[in-house]
Amino acid sequence: KWDYMKTVDYHKPFGYMWECPNYLSFEKKKFLFCCPQGLESHNYDYEAIYQNGYFPLTTDLEKDCVLEDFIEFDHGFDIYAQQFFKDEKGRMIMAGWMGLPDIDYTNPTVEEGRQHAFTLFREITEHEGRLYQFPIEEYKSLREEKKEVQGTSLTMNTSCFECHITDLPQSFKLHLRGVNMNYEDGLLTIDMNKSGSGRGVKHIKIPKMNNMTLFSDTSSLELF
């Protein structure tokens, strides 16, 4: 049974639907997380067909709160309908749908009667009014052989790996599994090329990158 509580307004038109809302409560800040539909791409913002992100709230949702400016959360090609819960350790955990509706991809697994997946489960934290995400620490138990390289290329006989790149220069290029990444002047450009099955190019504005962590399996690549 649902009871009506209130209507939450934003100070300007913002799409035609906010799907999959979640109310996230941290000690110092509250957030309304949702997946807006109907936003126009502008200056590399909102490049996906549908977005995901959050409105910081000035106070509790039950009170006369005001929605602050929307912050796009995850810039992946396929991420939607995130759900959140608190685990037995008190952590805020998130998982999302690694897929999108209403889009013409040519995923090769469709011929096998399947497509899409869950994202990695991620711990969500709050710092100075913003949300941060990183894979839960339990994935460390899956680690096996470790390899370290410096100043050279690395060839592996598997597509399933976790990769940490540290001490990144101010600009760099990275080619990995058919995907080209270029970082320059605070802009990360990811080009999926033919490996994208209809996914093309995305841009993420990141003022400074010190390190990068990648999780790869046979059909996906998650970048943090």
Please describe what each predicted stretch is:
Residues 1-4, 20-24, 29-42, 91-98, ...:
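Hydrophobic core segments of beta-strands in well-ordered, beta-rich domains
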Residues 8-16, 71-76:
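Short loop/turn motifs that recur once per blade in beta-propeller domains
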Residues 10-11, 38, 100, 137:
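Short, solvent-exposed coil/turn elements at secondary-structure transition points
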Residues 11, 21-25, 223:
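Conserved catalytic-core segments centered on acid/base and nucleophilic motifs
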Residues 12, 22, 118, 122:
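Solvent-exposed, flexible loop/coil residues
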Residues 17-20, 78-80:
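Beta-rich catalytic cores
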Residues 26-27, 36, 43-61:
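Acidic, glycine-rich loop-and-beta core segments that form the ion-binding/anion-interacting portion
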Residues 50-224:
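Beta-rich accessory regions
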